[in-house]
Protein backbone atom coordinates (compact mmCIF):
# COMPACT_ATOMS: atom_id res chain seq x y z
CA UNK A 1 0.00 0.00 0.00
CA UNK A 2 0.91 3.66 -0.19
CA UNK A 3 2.06 3.75 3.45
CA UNK A 4 4.59 0.98 3.06
CA UNK A 5 8.14 1.05 1.79
CA UNK A 6 9.15 -1.52 -0.79
CA UNK A 7 11.60 -4.11 0.46
CA UNK A 8 12.74 -4.57 -3.16
CA UNK A 9 14.12 -1.08 -3.54
CA UNK A 10 16.97 -0.78 -1.09
CA UNK A 11 16.81 2.99 -0.68
CA UNK A 12 13.21 4.06 -1.01
CA UNK A 13 13.45 6.85 1.58
CA UNK A 14 16.39 9.12 0.87
CA UNK A 15 15.68 12.28 2.81
CA UNK A 16 15.53 12.85 6.54
CA UNK A 17 12.46 14.61 7.94
CA UNK A 18 14.56 17.65 8.87
CA UNK A 19 15.81 17.92 5.26
CA UNK A 20 12.26 17.96 3.94
CA UNK A 21 11.23 20.55 6.53
CA UNK A 22 14.23 22.75 5.69
CA UNK A 23 13.38 22.62 1.99
CA UNK A 24 9.85 23.88 2.66
CA UNK A 25 11.24 26.89 4.54
CA UNK A 26 13.68 27.97 1.81
CA UNK A 27 12.84 30.67 -0.73
CA UNK A 28 11.48 29.08 -3.90
CA UNK A 29 14.25 30.53 -6.04
CA UNK A 30 17.23 29.43 -3.92
CA UNK A 31 19.90 27.53 -5.81
CA UNK A 32 20.17 24.08 -4.32
CA UNK A 33 22.90 21.59 -5.05
CA UNK A 34 21.53 18.09 -4.76
CA UNK A 35 23.03 15.60 -2.35
CA UNK A 36 21.25 12.57 -3.81
CA UNK A 37 20.17 11.91 -7.37
CA UNK A 38 18.36 8.92 -8.83
CA UNK A 39 18.41 8.90 -12.61
CA UNK A 40 17.24 6.62 -15.37
CA UNK A 41 18.83 7.13 -18.76
CA UNK A 42 16.44 4.81 -20.56
CA UNK A 43 13.91 2.04 -20.03
CA UNK A 44 15.80 -0.48 -22.17
CA UNK A 45 15.77 -3.79 -20.33
CA UNK A 46 16.30 -7.42 -21.23
CA UNK A 47 13.90 -8.84 -18.61
CA UNK A 48 10.18 -8.66 -17.77
CA UNK A 49 10.24 -8.85 -13.97
CA UNK A 50 6.85 -9.39 -12.36
CA UNK A 51 7.18 -6.24 -10.24
CA UNK A 52 8.05 -4.06 -13.24
CA UNK A 53 6.02 -2.61 -16.12
CA UNK A 54 6.34 -1.10 -19.63
CA UNK A 55 7.36 2.30 -18.26
CA UNK A 56 10.62 0.72 -17.05
CA UNK A 57 11.18 -2.24 -19.37
CA UNK A 58 11.32 -2.44 -23.14
CA UNK A 59 10.89 -6.21 -22.80
CA UNK A 60 7.39 -5.53 -21.42
CA UNK A 61 6.78 -3.08 -24.29
CA UNK A 62 7.75 -5.73 -26.84
CA UNK A 63 5.39 -8.21 -25.18
CA UNK A 64 2.44 -5.80 -25.31
CA UNK A 65 3.22 -4.84 -28.91
CA UNK A 66 3.27 -8.53 -29.84
CA UNK A 67 0.27 -9.82 -27.85
CA UNK A 68 -1.72 -6.71 -26.99
CA UNK A 69 -2.73 -5.25 -23.64
CA UNK A 70 -3.11 -7.60 -20.71
CA UNK A 71 -6.68 -8.59 -19.94
CA UNK A 72 -8.19 -9.24 -16.50
CA UNK A 73 -4.99 -8.30 -14.74
CA UNK A 74 -5.09 -7.52 -11.06
CA UNK A 75 -3.17 -4.30 -10.52
CA UNK A 76 -2.94 -1.14 -8.47
CA UNK A 77 -5.26 0.66 -10.87
CA UNK A 78 -2.62 2.68 -12.71
CA UNK A 79 -3.11 0.77 -15.96
CA UNK A 80 0.53 -0.19 -16.40
CA UNK A 81 -0.17 -3.15 -18.66
CA UNK A 82 -2.87 -1.57 -20.81
CA UNK A 83 -0.45 0.22 -23.13
CA UNK A 84 3.25 0.53 -23.85
CA UNK A 85 3.77 3.72 -21.82
CA UNK A 86 4.64 5.82 -24.88
CA UNK A 87 5.38 8.77 -22.62
CA UNK A 88 8.49 6.88 -21.44
CA UNK A 89 10.04 6.74 -24.90
CA UNK A 90 13.45 8.44 -25.02
CA UNK A 91 13.57 11.94 -26.48
CA UNK A 92 16.04 10.69 -29.12
CA UNK A 93 17.25 7.32 -30.30
CA UNK A 94 20.93 8.10 -29.74
CA UNK A 95 22.34 9.42 -26.47
CA UNK A 96 24.23 12.22 -28.19
CA UNK A 97 20.95 13.47 -29.70
CA UNK A 98 19.01 13.42 -26.42
CA UNK A 99 18.95 16.95 -24.95
CA UNK A 100 18.04 15.69 -21.48
CA UNK A 101 20.97 13.31 -21.26
CA UNK A 102 23.31 15.96 -22.63
CA UNK A 103 22.01 18.47 -20.05
CA UNK A 104 22.64 15.93 -17.29
CA UNK A 105 26.26 15.38 -18.37
CA UNK A 106 26.83 19.13 -18.60
CA UNK A 107 25.38 19.58 -15.09
CA UNK A 108 27.57 16.69 -13.91
CA UNK A 109 30.72 18.39 -15.19
CA UNK A 110 29.70 21.84 -13.90
CA UNK A 111 29.60 20.97 -10.21
CA UNK A 112 27.12 18.18 -9.59
CA UNK A 113 29.86 15.54 -9.52
CA UNK A 114 31.77 17.49 -6.88
CA UNK A 115 28.82 18.01 -4.54
CA UNK A 116 26.74 14.89 -4.89
CA UNK A 117 26.84 12.43 -2.00
CA UNK A 118 25.04 9.69 -3.88
CA UNK A 119 23.94 8.87 -7.40
CA UNK A 120 21.74 5.89 -8.19
CA UNK A 121 21.17 4.77 -11.75
CA UNK A 122 18.01 2.82 -12.37
CA UNK A 123 16.37 1.72 -15.56
CA UNK A 124 15.41 -0.26 -17.41
CA UNK A 125 18.70 -2.03 -17.06
CA UNK A 126 21.47 0.53 -16.41
CA UNK A 127 24.29 -1.53 -17.91
CA UNK A 128 22.44 -1.54 -21.26
CA UNK A 129 22.75 2.24 -21.59
CA UNK A 130 25.85 4.18 -22.73
CA UNK A 131 25.17 6.90 -20.13
CA UNK A 132 26.06 4.49 -17.33
CA UNK A 133 29.34 3.55 -18.99
CA UNK A 134 30.06 7.22 -19.61
CA UNK A 135 29.90 7.80 -15.83
CA UNK A 136 32.20 4.85 -15.17
CA UNK A 137 34.64 6.34 -17.70
CA UNK A 138 34.38 9.73 -15.97
CA UNK A 139 35.43 8.17 -12.64
CA UNK A 140 38.37 6.48 -14.38
CA UNK A 141 39.48 9.73 -16.01
CA UNK A 142 38.92 11.91 -12.91
CA UNK A 143 40.25 9.93 -9.95
CA UNK A 144 40.57 13.08 -7.80
CA UNK A 145 36.89 14.03 -8.18
CA UNK A 146 33.77 12.41 -6.77
CA UNK A 147 35.70 10.64 -4.00
CA UNK A 148 32.93 11.20 -1.43
CA UNK A 149 30.12 10.00 -3.69
CA UNK A 150 28.30 6.68 -3.40
CA UNK A 151 27.59 5.30 -6.87
CA UNK A 152 24.89 2.65 -7.11
CA UNK A 153 23.18 0.94 -9.99
CA UNK A 154 19.96 -1.03 -9.82
CA UNK A 155 21.04 -3.81 -12.16
CA UNK A 156 19.60 -7.25 -12.80
CA UNK A 157 23.20 -8.40 -13.51
CA UNK A 158 21.93 -10.43 -16.45
CA UNK A 159 23.84 -8.93 -19.36
CA UNK A 160 23.36 -10.12 -22.91
CA UNK A 161 26.98 -11.37 -22.96
CA UNK A 162 29.46 -12.33 -20.21
CA UNK A 163 31.82 -9.63 -21.53
CA UNK A 164 29.44 -6.94 -20.27
CA UNK A 165 29.57 -8.34 -16.74
CA UNK A 166 33.36 -8.52 -16.95
CA UNK A 167 33.36 -4.88 -18.09
CA UNK A 168 31.17 -3.90 -15.12
CA UNK A 169 33.51 -5.63 -12.69
CA UNK A 170 36.55 -3.99 -14.29
CA UNK A 171 35.02 -0.49 -14.39
CA UNK A 172 33.67 -0.71 -10.83
CA UNK A 173 37.23 -0.66 -9.45
CA UNK A 174 37.62 2.97 -10.57
CA UNK A 175 34.62 4.09 -8.49
CA UNK A 176 35.58 4.69 -4.84
CA UNK A 177 32.17 3.89 -3.33
CA UNK A 178 30.46 1.54 -5.76
CA UNK A 179 27.33 -0.24 -4.56
Residue ranges and their predicted role:
Residues 1, 44-55:
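Local cysteine-cluster metal-coordination motifs and their immediate loop/turn environment
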Residues 1-35, 55:
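Flexible, acidic/Gly-rich N-terminal and inter-domain linker regions that tether
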Residues 11, 16, 82, 137-140:
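Compositionally biased, low-structure terminal segments
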Residues 16-30, 96-110, 163-168:
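A Trp-anchored, charged/polar loop motif used as the substrate-binding/catalytic surface
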Residues 27, 86, 106-107, 137, ...:
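Residues in intrinsically disordered, low-complexity segments of regulatory proteins
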Residues 34-44, 55-99, 114-130, 142-164, ...:
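Core AdoMet radical
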Residues 37, 104-107, 115, 135:
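Alpha-helical packing segments of well-folded alpha/beta enzyme cores
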Residues 104-105, 132-141, 164-170:
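Short, well-ordered amphipathic alpha-helices
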Amino acid sequence: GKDHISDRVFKTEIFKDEDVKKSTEMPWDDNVMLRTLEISFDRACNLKCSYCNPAFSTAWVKDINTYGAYQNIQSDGRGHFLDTAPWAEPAAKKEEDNPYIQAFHQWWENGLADNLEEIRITGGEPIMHPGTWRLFDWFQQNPERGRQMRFAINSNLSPQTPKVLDKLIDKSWSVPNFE
